Design a protein with these regions (language model features):
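Short amphipathic, charge-patterned alpha-helical segments
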Residues: 218-220, 369-385
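Gly-rich Lys/Arg/Thr-decorated short loops/hinges at beta-loop-alpha junctions or inter-strand turns
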Residues: 10, 125-128, 133-140, 190-204, ...
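Iron-sulfur cluster-binding cysteine motifs and their immediate structural context
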Residues: 53-57, 459-465, 545-564, 575-589
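Ferredoxin-type iron-sulfur electron-transfer modules in oxidoreductases and energy-metabolism complexes
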Residues: 1-7, 19-44, 61-90, 135, ...
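C-terminal accessory/binding modules appended to enzymatic or scaffolding proteins
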Residues: 347-361, 367-369, 373, 529-567, ...
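Conserved phosphate/anionic-ligand binding catalytic regions in large, soluble enzymes, centered on
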Residues: 16, 159-180, 279-291, 297, ...
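Hydrophobic alpha-helical positions that pack around
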Residues: 243-369, 381
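Flexible inter-domain linker/hinge segments
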Residues: 92-160, 313, 320-335
């Protein structure tokens, strides 16, 4: 903070920007100038993680955390807190149990069990200012690597740390680097997979928006270790803010000599370019990603050969995702003992999750491997809204599985998740309560993967389409119990014969929900699911038309009053839906 008395940290991640944090920053600058305050600075930061409470403003070193800040609140914060030292209570986060304001971020339950490694600088530094990154030990790991370590030393350190890929399967990062290093040839490449395709996942985007220099530094370290002189970041074009900040970081790194020729006078040359993806989910698979960068169709190829042997332009290529890279500089500087002290025996370090769904606190959480779903949902997430019961967590994105109440205390790591029919994936974590229909959930994810299939292999292209047809028949009251066995058999056939990970894991949500919620499938197969229309009382105008037209007289309510449908008597004929002039009648699922 240099000679500053206070720093005003304003979140400018995508979520807060959409809620006008740009204007919040402008208003703080104007107010500071208006009051002629010389020892206070307003600066932008990346995502704080607590996205459900944004826009967020934090005052340092007071550690006061303001939530739901609007541009109109700025003058009050400056007049009360900055000038007179009185925090604005109405903007503080409220304890959900007693509604008392919490002044200090460290006392908030959302952050209580988090351990920030990959997200360490997000919410602390200005992501568009390389000097800020340097002040937090930025590029010190690169200096150490280039002046004190051989490439094999670096690889051995990453191996010893136990770091595993954070993008899906959890392959050991050090072994992947070793394979590329061992591959013959002078021309090698290192890629960063920033094509974050899971619905609801935004971990990688937030790291690139909040700490882009950490990825530049890590890729340069990886290039040195594997023998690559050229790096490529493959990022989806739908991430304009992340792209802007990554471009800024690369440009500034070149200006400072951290990229380019003879970095730190070591004789090592390395540079990075950005390539854009069009949002295809399948391009998150490393061979499809490489094909896309080469200008080809984004289709996976069978392995071996692996990219570490034959990748981009036929040359050895390393592919890691954003979160994996974000761990590298910290491991280099703090050592393997520090990193291995977090996590479980086979899954070291932390994992970032995008917590969403039926939970009170939504946002990004970074927790040590080995934490339980109960701790994430109830201690960090604040529990289920409206007193509803926990039903399941969907983990691993569209290709993942369910963690139910029976497994809510299972420590989360790669092996444990695999044993219960789920997977780590990139880190999507969707909480579901007693009202969620698990057959509908399975259909939702299958619709996504079926739509995202590249179409190269028949099991995925045709198999997922047939699966979806059978699921829709069940939900439309056209299925039978025989269909359940057909669905399960087709799931296993697709898994065993699809060409790539997308097809091989597409049936996971179906198999997982069939395993843990068989009764819900049986109810549909036996035609026991009651289908009834409902009336949205906020829209109902009491015109009484629906009640007059209903053939079974199951709608109650006098003219000019809110009406209600008796769901036990409703035959789902749709007459009320067609009759209502204001769209107040809601169709059954």
């Amino acid at each position: 903070m240099n000679n500053l008395r206070l720093q005003i940290l304003i979140c400018k991640g995508t979520g807060c920007v959409s809620a006008r944090s740009d204007l919040i920053k402008e208003n703080f600058d104007r107010a500071i100038e208006h009051y002629k305050i010389k020892d206070v600075e307003a600066m932008i930061t990346g995502c704080f993680g607590f996205c459900g409470e944004g826009p967020i403003v934090k005052i340092e070193p007071d550690n006061v955390f303001y939530t739901h800040v609007s541009p109109d609140d700025v003058n009050e914060i400056v007049a009360e807190h900055i000038i007179h030292g009185r925090p604005v209570k109405r903007l503080l986060y409220k304890n959900p149990k007693n509604k008392e304001p919490i002044y200090n971020q460290k006392e908030m339950s959302f952050y209580g069990k988090q351990t920030r490694v990959a997200l360490k600088n997000c919410g602390k530094i200005d992501p568009e200012n390389i000097d800020d990154y340097i002040s937090y030990d930025g590029y010190q790991a690169l200096l150490k690597v280039l002046t004190e370590m051989t490439p094999q030393d670096v690889i051995d350190l990453i191996k010893a740390s136990g770091l595993r890929g954070r993008g899906g399967g959890g392959f050991p990062t050090g072994i992947k680097w070793q394979n590329t290093y061992n591959s013959p040839g002078e021309e090698k490449y290192i890629f960063c997979n920033a094509d974050e395709g899971d619905p609801g996942a935004f971990m990688d985007r937030s790291i690139l928006e909040g700490d882009p220099n950490s990825i530049v530094e890590a890729m340069t370290i990886g290039g040195y270790a594997t023998g690559a002189k050229h790096g490529v970041v493959y990022i989806r074009a739908e991430y304009p803010l992340a792209i802007h900040r990554l471009k800024t970081a690369i440009s500034q790194a070149r200006d400072y000599g951290f990229l380019g020729k003879n970095i730190f006078n070591s004789g090592f040359d390395f540079d990075i370019e950005i390539r854009y993806g069009a949002g295809a989910f399948v391009c998150g698979e490393e061979t499809a990603l490489i094909h896309s960068v080469e200008g080809k169709r984004g289709e996976p190829t069978r392995k071996p050969p692996f990219p570490s042997v034959k990748g981009y332009m036929g040359k050895p290529t390393t592919v890691n995702n954003v979160e994996t890279y974000a761990n590298i500089p910290k491991i280099i500087l703090r050592g393997t003992d520090w990193f291995t002290s977090m996590g479980t025996e086979k899954s070291k370090g932390t994992k970032v999750f995008a917590l969403a769904g039926k939970v009170n606190n939504v946002g990004l959480v970074e927790v040590p491997m080995g934490i339980t779903i109960r701790e994430i949902v109830y201690d960090i997430g604040g529990g289920i809204p409206n007193g509803k019961k926990f039903k399941a967590v969907q983990i691993g994105g569209p290709s993942g599985g369910m963690i139910t109440k029976e497994n809510i205390d299972t420590p989360i790591d790669y092996e444990n998740l695999r044993e219960i029919g789920a997977m780590m994936g990139s880190g999507g974590l969707i909480v579901m309560d007693e009202d969620n229909d698990m057959v509908e959930i399975a259909k939702f994810y299958l619709e996504f993967t079926q739509d995202e299939s590249c179409g190269k292999c028949t099991p995925c292209r045709v198999g997922t389409k047939r699966l979806l047809e059978m699921l829709k028949n069940l939900l439309d009251d056209k299925g039978s119990e025989d269909d359940l066995q057909k669905i399960e058999d087709l799931c296993h056939n697709i898994i065993n014969s699809a060409a790539c990970g997308l097809g091989q894991t597409a049936p996971n949500p179906i198999l997982s929900t069939m395993k843990y919620f068989p009764d819900e499938y049986l109810k549909y197969a036996r035609h026991e699911v009651k289908r009834a229309y409902k009336i949205n009382k906020d829209k109902c105008i009491g015109c009484h038309r629906c009640a007059r037209e209903c053939p079974v007289k199951c709608i109650s309510g006098n003219p000019k009053e809110k009406h209600e449908i008796n769901e036990d008597k409703c035959i789902a004929c749709g007459t009320c839906f067609k009759t209502c002039p204001v769209g107040a009648v809601v169709e059954p699922k």
